[in-house]
Curated annotation (Swiss-Prot):
It comes from Rhizobium etli (strain CIAT 652). The gene is rplD. This is Large ribosomal subunit protein uL4. The keyword RNA-binding applies. Gene3D superfamilies: 3.40.1370.10. Residues 64-77 have a biased composition (Basic residues). Belongs to the universal ribosomal protein uL4 family. GO terms for molecular function: rRNA binding; structural constituent of ribosome.
Length: 206
């Protein structure tokens, strides 16, 4: 398939050919869901913690004698049923990360790209380069292109001026091609690829 290439000023800059093996798949929501769940699980902190009965600061002595009081049998006041006692089966510090095969991760990226193409939400820009690091000027260019919620993917090296100018614009993300991922593609409305990014994707999946 072919897409029109535009400049940041909104002018035509030719066409680019896209591989059907990368951009022409029938999107599968289950694959996308698996990859996004894997990404978010990796990011989750897992610093939650509650003290168990072995960790609370309290005497471990038996509360009162076993027999003769007429009361229920108890040992330590650290037990979970008492105020100030330890939590039974409470949260512990752990990693929420789980494994996902590389083939599924790669397939998820291709399905995310295909989903954006199918929704007509992909724009190819010839070059993501700004002459100066001015947010106002870049925001005006984005408005001309109708980009209010978008992910920009550049080549291996991002233009410093473009990155600086874009980082303060709401709902706009800028990543190098190495950072392209399913979650960021799906969470933004439009996907904007530079010609260098398209070439890198073709090379990666050939």
């Amino acid at each position: 398939m072919e897409l029109n290439v535009k400049t940041l000023e909104g002018k035509d800059a030719g066409k680019v050919s896209l591989s059907d093996a990368i951009f022409g798949l029938e999107p599968r929501e289950d694959i996308l869901a698996r990859v996004i769940r894997w990404q978010l699980a990796k990011k989750q902190q897992g610093t939650h913690k509650a003290k168990g009965r072995a960790e609370v600061s309290r005497t471990g002595a038996k509360m009162y004698k076993q027999k003769g009081t007429g009361r229920a049998r108890h040992h330590s006041a650290r037990a979970p049923q008492f105020r100030g006692g330890g939590k039974a089966h409470g949260p512990v510090v752990r990693s929420h990360e789980h494994d996902l095969p590389k083939k599924v991760r790669a397939l998820g990226l291709r399905h995310a790209l295909s989903a954006k193409i199918k929704a007509d939400d992909v724009i190819v820009i010839d070059n993501l380069v700004a002459t100066e690091a001015k947010t106002k000027a870049l925001a005006s260019a984005f408005e001309t292109l109708g980009l209010t919620n978008a992910l920009f993917i550049g080549g291996a090296e991002l233009d410093g001026n473009f990155k600086l100018a874009a980082q303060n614009i709401p709902n706009i993300d800028v990543l190098p091609i190495q950072g392209i991922n399913v979650y960021d593609i799906v969470r933004r409305g439009k996907l904007v690829l530079s010609k260098a990014a398209v070439e890198a994707l073709e090379e990666r999946f050939k």
